[in-house]
From Swiss-Prot:
Region described as Disordered: 182-205
Biased composition, class Basic and acidic residues, residue ranges: 189-198
GO MF annotations in UniProt: 4-coumarate-CoA ligase activity; ATP binding; CoA-ligase activity; trans-cinnamate-CoA ligase activity
BP terms from Gene Ontology: phenylpropanoid metabolic process
GO cellular component entries: peroxisome
Keywords for the protein's UniProt record, in alphabetical order: ATP-binding, Ligase, Magnesium, Nucleotide-binding
Pfam families: AMP-binding, AMP-binding_C
Annotated positions binding (E)-4-coumaroyl-AMP: 256, 324, 346-347, 351, 449, 453
Lineage: Eukaryota, Viridiplantae, Streptophyta, Embryophyta, Tracheophyta
Originating organism: Oryza sativa subsp. japonica (Rice)
Comment, domains: Both substrate-binding domains (SBD1 and SBD2) are involved in the substrate recognition, and are sufficient to confer the substrate specificity.
Protein name: 4-coumarate--CoA ligase-like 4
Chain residue ranges for the region called SBD1: 279-346
Catalytic activity as recorded in UniProt: (E)-4-coumarate + ATP + CoA = (E)-4-coumaroyl-CoA + AMP + diphosphate; (E)-4-coumarate + ATP + H(+) = (E)-4-coumaroyl-AMP + diphosphate; (E)-4-coumaroyl-AMP + CoA = (E)-4-coumaroyl-CoA + AMP + H(+)
Length: 552
């Protein structure tokens, strides 16, 4: 009798030669067998010893778990009734900075089977109007300050994420209530609930569009439930008597913030301290005032902490969790030297994978410099040669494909993009060039679509960026493909110089040329005051490409 593929999985790397796939070295997390479970019911049913769910960092207001779930039930009852009449399949938009109201609005809408979409408050009215036209929400949660950014569609109802109404609110017919009003509603026990299953859409989040137009990503209740279980396992939060306190510095409109702070952590009894926006002094005050133990952040915040002349006071902080973009060796070492008492952990994920894919879950795992970590629980991966389509073994670079219960359902109203990204048997083509080493650690080399094609060679921008960041007079950098008739494309660098530096284009090009193969040389340089990045810290190369080519 032949050996099954299951028996042929290499325990060290997770690679199965028979199927040419990698399997996570982490134990699978249990998922509910009942198909008729929505993420809100799942979260509310978790048992834990936590008391305080949310804290407003600015005011100190505390919301207990009892108050949170009462508010969610009340808000859901109010939203299901006239005049909003929110139903399963309707889309609800949240346009808001971080606040303790954000999770209440999100959970109330999803509990009804509505699909949640979010927008960046920094977006222009035109950008928001484009998303509204695509998603067609029937309800928007927003603040008084952001209300003018919403298109004046007559059929769009608005719930203000404010504590009380003001006299001027009555002049806008779109406003039906405040979040405090609907949260105080007595839940109607006779209300008929729509049947919501794990396969139903839960969120419609628009991808960052770092390389092209933004697309709506549809995730299901199963996706979010998987994420909740993986988060609780990663931080060993379930069944613990100790309450951890997380500081929310990342935007809840982004997949990272939404799945962690507005959903995942609320299922395990952790306390979430909410910053309305990131400012270093306010972050430090909150860390010390509220006894924060975990600090999830994006790389630019980490850079600021390392760049500070003296170590910052971090109180009871034990772990920093970085996501959104990979961390370089120099940054990790600089942080460890300045804050030896704090572990630094990393994560890798996409909007399309509900922010899940790989992570380092201990200081020891993070010491493998450059890694995104081990594959997440319940995850399979392939490394696929972009040219031949062949699945590759250990230590070979190709496009990362992943499969797991958290993978998106597809792109909203975009069958072509869905078919090119999701295979019929559930593999998500990430668009990232990666390899998995002999111990099962994932390394992200670059974005497949961002490779610079110089003659017949492929040049990863991230490699040149990492090199340029080692220059003592460079504080930030982005490398893009610059079109050229003879060679196709060549590397162009946008550089942010250190204050007082007179670094020249020639010096930059010589610095790189001494350390790389000829085809990787930087052949054009521009100096800028900052590098455009999205909310998760990823470089917006498309903006820089547009800037560079607009002068041609």
């Amino acid at each position: 009798m032949g050996r099954s593929p299951e028996m042929e999985v290499d325990a060290r790397s997770g690679y199965c030669a028979a199927t040419r796939t990698f399997r996570s070295r982490r134990a699978d997390v249990p998922l509910p067998a009942d198909p008729e479970v929505d993420v809100v019911s799942f979260l509310a049913s978790r048992r834990h010893s936590g008391v305080v769910a949310l804290v407003d960092a600015a005011t100190g207001r505390r919301i207990t778990f009892t108050e949170l779930w009462r508010a969610v039930a009340g808000a859901a009852s109010a939203l299901a009734a006239h005049p909003v009449s929110l139903r399963k399949g309707h889309v609800a938009l949240i346009l808001s900075p971080n606040s303790v109201h954000f999770p209440v609005a999100a959970l109330a809408a999803m509990s009804l089977g509505a699909v949640l979409t979010t927008a960046n408050p920094l977006n222009t009215p035109a950008e928001i109007a484009k998303q509204v036209a695509d998603a067609r929400p029937v309800l928007a949660f927003t603040t008084r300050e952001l209300l003018p950014k919403l298109p004046r569609a007559h059929d769009l109802r608005v719930v203000l994420l404010e504590s009380a109404r003001l006299p001027g609110d009555s002049s806008d017919p779109r406003i039906v209530a405040t979040i405090e009003e609907i949260s105080a509603t007595t839940p109607d026990p006779a209300r008929r609930k729509d049947r919501v299953t794990q396969d139903d859409p839960a969120t419609l989040l628009y991808s960052s569009g770092t390389t092209g137009p933004s697309k709506g990503v549809v995730a299901t209740h199963r996706s979010l439930i998987s994420m909740v279980q993986i988060i609780m396992t990663r931080f060993r939060l379930e069944g613990s008597d100790k309450t951890e306190t997380f500081l929310c510095t990342v935007p809840m409109f982004h997949v990272y913030g939404l799945v962690a702070f507005a959903t995942g952590l609320l299922g395990c009894g952790a306390t979430v301290v909410v910053l309305s926006k990131y400012e270093l002094p306010e972050m430090l005050r909150s860390i010390n005032a509220y006894g924060v133990t975990y600090l999830p952040l994006v790389p630019p915040i980490l850079v600021a902490m390392v760049a500070h002349p003296k170590p910052l006071p971090l109180g009871q902080m034990r772990k920093v969790l970085s996501g959104g973009a990979p961390l370089g060796k120099e940054l990790i070492e600089g942080f460890r030297e300045k804050y030896p008492q704090v572990e630094i952990l990393q994560g890798y994920g996409l909007t399309e994978s509900t922010a899940i894919g790989a992570s380092t879950d201990s200081a020891e795992e993070s010491r493998r410099y450059g890694t995104a970590g081990l594959l997440s629980p319940n995850t399979e991966a392939k490394i696929v040669d972009p040219d031949s389509g062949e699945a590759l073994p250990v230590n070979r670079t190709g496009e990362l494909w992943i499969r797991g219960p958290y993978v998106m359902k597809g792109y909203f109203k975009n069958a072509e993009a869905t078919q090119s990204t999701l295979t019929p048997d559930g593999w998500l083509k990430t668009g990232d060039l990666c390899y998995i080493d002999e111990d099962g650690y994932l390394f992200v080399v670059d974005r497949l679509k961002e490779l610079i094609k110089y003659k017949g060679y492929q040049v990863p921008p991230a490699e040149l960026e990492a090199l340029l960041l080692t220059h003592p007079e460079v504080t930030d950098v982005a490398v893009i493909p610059f079109p050229d008739r003879e060679v196709g494309q060549f590397p162009m660098a946008y550089i942010v110089r250190k204050k007082g530096s007179n670094l020249s284009e020639r010096e930059v090009m010589e610095f790189v040329a001494k350390q790389v193969a000829p085809y990787k040389k930087v052949r054009k340089v521009a100096f800028v005051t900052d590098i455009p990045k999205n909310a998760s810290g990823k470089i917006l190369r498309k903006d820089l490409i547009k800037l560079a080519t607009s002068k041609l």
